[in-house]
């Protein structure tokens, strides 16, 4: 082999090694998230959700069944998928698969694990390992009674699937004046049977944004997860971040434009009104952005916290616990009227 061919083969070998390293780097989480994600959200196929990558850095399109997956390209967990990396010796890439599970029985019909179906025009359901999850196709909004509409109710409209709000034939007011904001339904909602002869499809909305950008606020949702299968409003305490800046917070940025999630430097007692938590906690808070973007909770859960309000009086309240936060440009608009209404109803004992 000539010297020229040897040099050419050597160059091609280095180029191939470089490309392999580049591809491998895109599969694993970087040591530090990029300072700014693409300004345009990823364009996903119809029915495919946009989710944070496995590194909680930037939004990506969730990978579907049979597609390749990695840390940077997570599978659609809302569809019950997981990334099977058993075929990769480096445990970096895999294929989105559905775990083997039990069949489901709904209204006398047997559905296979992973099978999707529509029991009626109002719900889109999926069988997942013996459990049925359904997503409402109709809007799950709630219209509260008010001066313009003291007795709102939903009625069926001929020729349409979804019911609509009405105040009755004698009402003159307009609809929607005191309606809660349109809630996004949870990715999956379960089906619980309160009676062997009645199918109750559970409907639960996502928690609303916290009523305060700093300090203790309130968050609400609507659910029918009860024995009566009736829609009721639930409220929890929430704190996105403390109003006072902790020492060292300004220096934690280290040149970055956004600090997504930060943990309290010391154990603190949670407080609301004249009540103080019995135990101390080290909660996570959402950080701040220096480029005008907003930083809000992305993944949360709810825990029961014991508070002491008066000597000898102990009560339990649901409290939001932040898992991760995300920075974005879709900042909440000014909705002071709704927040004041929420605070007023809570002070009346509706919490």
Swiss-Prot record:
May be palmitoylated on Cys-238, which is important for extracellular secretion. Residues 1-21 form the signal peptide. The keyword Lipoprotein applies. Disulfide bonds join 29-55, 33-57, 37-58, 44-61, 69-83, 75-96, 258-295, 275-309, 286-325, 289-327, 294-331. GO terms for biological process: angiogenesis; bone regeneration; cell adhesion; cell adhesion mediated by integrin; cell chemotaxis; chondrocyte differentiation; endothelial cell chemotaxis; endothelial cell-cell adhesion. It comes from the Eukaryota. Residues 102-168 form the VWFC domain. A lipid is attached at residue 238 (S-palmitoyl cysteine). Induction: During persistent inflammatory pain the expression levels are down-regulated. Residues 25-99 form the IGFBP N-terminal domain. Residues 258-332 form the CTCK domain. It is found in: Secreted; Cytoplasm; Cell junction, Gap junction. Widely expressed. Highly expressed in neurons of dorsal root ganglia and dorsal horn of the spinal cord (at protein level). Expressed in astrocytes (at protein level). In cartilage, dominantly expressed in the chondrocyte territorial matrix. Residues 199-244 form the TSP type-1 domain. InterPro entries: CCN (IPR050941), Cys_knot_C (IPR006207), Glyco_hormone_CN (IPR006208), Growth_fac_rcpt_cys_sf (IPR009030), IGFBP-like (IPR000867), IGFBP_CNN (IPR012395), Insulin_GF-bd_Cys-rich_CS (IPR017891), TSP1_CCN (IPR043973). Interacts with FBLN1. Interacts (via CTCK domain) with NOTCH1 (via the EGF-like repeat region). Interacts with GJA1/CX43. Interacts with ITGA5:ITGB1, ITGAV:ITGB3 and ITGAV:ITGB5. Interacts with ZDHHC22; the interaction may lead to CCN3 palmitoylation. This is CCN family member 3. It comes from Rattus norvegicus (Rat). The lineage of its organism: Eukaryota, Metazoa, Chordata, Craniata, Vertebrata. The gene is Ccn3.
């Amino acid at each position: 082999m000539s010297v020229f061919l040897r040099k050419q083969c050597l160059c091609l070998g280095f180029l191939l090694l470089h490309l392999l390293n580049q591809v491998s780097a895109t599969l694993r989480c970087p040591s530090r998230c990029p300072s700014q994600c693409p300004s345009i959200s990823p364009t996903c196929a119809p029915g495919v959700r946009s989710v944070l990558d496995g590194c909680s850095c930037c939004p990506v399109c969730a990978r579907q069944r049979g597609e390749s997956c990695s840390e940077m390209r997570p599978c659609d967990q809302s569809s019950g998928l997981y990334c099977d990396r058993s075929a990769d010796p480096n445990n970096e890439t895999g294929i989105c698969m559905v775990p083997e599970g039990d069949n489901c029985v709904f209204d006398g019909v047997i559905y296979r694990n992973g099978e999707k179906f529509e029991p009626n025009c109002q719900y889109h359901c999926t069988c997942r390992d013996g459990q049925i999850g359904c997503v409402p196709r109709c809007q799950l909004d709630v219209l509260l009674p008010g001066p313009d509409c003291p007795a709102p109710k939903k009625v069926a409209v001929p020729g349409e699937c979804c019911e609509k709000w009405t105040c009755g034939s004698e009402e003159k007011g307009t609809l929607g004046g005191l309606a809660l904001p349109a809630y996004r339904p949870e990715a999956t909602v379960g089906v619980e049977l309160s009676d062997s002869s009645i199918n109750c499809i559970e409907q639960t909305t996502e928690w609303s944004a916290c009523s305060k950008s700093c300090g203790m606020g309130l968050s609400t949702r609507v659910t029918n997860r009860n024995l009566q299968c009736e829609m009721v409003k639930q409220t929890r305490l929430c704190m996105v971040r403390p109003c006072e800046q902790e020492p060292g917070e300004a220096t934690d940025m280290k040149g970055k434009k956004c600090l997504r999630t930060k943990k309290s430097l010391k154990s603190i007692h949670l407080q609301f009104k004249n009540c103080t938590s019995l135990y101390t906690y080290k909660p996570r808070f959402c950080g701040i952005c220096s480029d005008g973007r907003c930083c809000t909770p992305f993944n949360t859960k709810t825990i029961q916290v014991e508070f002491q309000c008066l000597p000898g009086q102990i009560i339990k309240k649901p409290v939001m616990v932040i898992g991760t936060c995300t920075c974005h440009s879709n900042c909440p608009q000014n909705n002071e009227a709704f927040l004041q209404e929420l605070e007023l109803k809570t002070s009346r004992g509706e919490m």
